[in-house]
Amino acid sequence: MQKLIIHGGKPLKGNINISGAKNAVLPIMAASILTDKLHITNVPKLTDVSTMKDLLRSHGACIEIIEHTDEFELIINTGNINNFTADYEIVRKMRASIWVLGPLLTKYGKAKVSLPGGCAIGARQVDLHIAVLKAMGATIEIEDGYINASSKGRLKGTHFVFDKVSVGATINAILAAVLAEGETVLFNCALEPEIVDLCNCLIKMGADIAGVGTSEITIKGKDSLNKMSYKVLSDRIEAGTYMFAAAITKGDVKICGIDYHIIENIALKLIETGIKVAPINNGVQVTYEGTLNSVDLETNPYPGFATDLQAQFMSLMTLSSGVSMITENIFENRFMHVPELCRMGADIVVRGNKAVVRGVEMLKGAEVMASDLRASVSLILAGLSTNSKTVLHRIYHLDRGFQDLEKKLSNCGADIKRV
């Protein structure tokens, strides 16, 4: 099994180009079911993207892959969808597989999707997905680990209030509503930029969507959607990760190819810690200037601080001057990186959904194990900060969400290699 070997103590200096957003491209790929052909550019080279390709092919899609140095182009032909079951063997690898449920159901009137997998960071039930589709007229039962959904005729527009903010359920509802009969109004929607990107793609395909980027989205269903080409936005989670990498290594890095407005909340949190963050053309520059203050953090739905960056921020706070409180409000099991950070000398105590982090002068290298995607990269950041050797095991998680991570870090002076 592969592992990463990191020799830390080297400040990162240089430029890092940000890849396409995983959390945007996956629902856009699922949206290809709603039309006959979709051309997607700026697609990151990730195993989750490969899993979604496998899933779409299992439904009968034909996918042409055009490979470039830093990205893929995908041409997805879905005119011959002939299988409406998303099997466990594919779905277990990635929770985003559930996003084929809405498109299959709204276009073909039936779908059978295995209950999803992905990182083991909490229950993340599918109740809201099912509730909104039932409100649109679907008949849904859960049998033998599968969601069996059907509708007599087209789904019907509805007014639906999400009782909690859910990125996944908001996406499935939008994907279903664009071909439903009549008007759908969704309340308490998630606001993530990746949802905005999906809506922009669907609008370009001919969907009628109002309220994009707000908590109230109105969709007037169409009979069909058009073929088109769309460029996926850049990955704010990847950008934030490298911003923290620059800070924890006392470096100076330009993060390129990302709109500042979607990472502004990350930048403001870093500025609180004493790190210099300056917008530049098509990106941001992060510079350590000798100070790293302890700052409290709470994860919340966007525009709050992303749960996908909580572990990385915690790594940074292990070296801060003082005590910080990190509160995880999204997932109930997202502190699995804490024992591994403590193996490296961090002083962290977890109490329920809160972690108290007391800054130490220095972390030390150790053999550590990744438990999930974001935890794995937090341990890399910790390893980069040490003056010794860190070995990270179970790095297959990384390839689900970070393209060319070792290359991007090495180009900025890091000593990191995969063996």
Swiss-Prot record:
Residue ranges of coiled coil: none
EC class of the enzyme, as a word: transferase
GO cellular component: cytoplasm
GO biological process: cell division; cell wall organization; peptidoglycan biosynthetic process; regulation of cell shape; UDP-N-acetylgalactosamine biosynthetic process
Chief location: cytoplasm
Pathway terms, separated by semicolons: Cell wall biogenesis; peptidoglycan biosynthesis
EC number of this enzyme: 2.5.1.7
Binding site for phosphoenolpyruvate: 22-23
Record localization: Cytoplasm
Reactions that this protein is recorded to catalyse: phosphoenolpyruvate + UDP-N-acetyl-alpha-D-glucosamine = UDP-N-acetyl-3-O-(1-carboxyvinyl)-alpha-D-glucosamine + phosphate
InterPro entries: Enolpyruvate_Tfrase_dom, Enolpyruvate_Tfrase_sf, MurA_subfamily, RNA3'P_cycl/enolpyr_Trfase_a/b, UDP_GlcNAc_COvinyl_MurA
Keywords assigned: Cell cycle, Cell division, Cell shape, Cell wall biogenesis/degradation, Cytoplasm, Peptidoglycan synthesis, Pyruvate, Transferase
Residues bearing PTM 2-(S-cysteinyl)pyruvic acid O-phosphothioketal: 119
Catalytic residues (positions): 119 (proton donor)
Residues that bind UDP-N-acetyl-alpha-D-glucosamine: 95, 164-167, 308, 330
Protein's UniProt keywords contain Acetylation: no
GO molecular function list: UDP-N-acetylglucosamine 1-carboxyvinyltransferase activity
Assigned protein family: Belongs to the EPSP synthase family. MurA subfamily.
Function: Cell wall formation. Adds enolpyruvyl to UDP-N-acetylglucosamine.
NCBIfam families, A to Z: murA (TIGR01072), PRK09369.1 (NF006873)
Protein name: UDP-N-acetylglucosamine 1-carboxyvinyltransferase
Organism annotation: Rickettsia akari (strain Hartford)
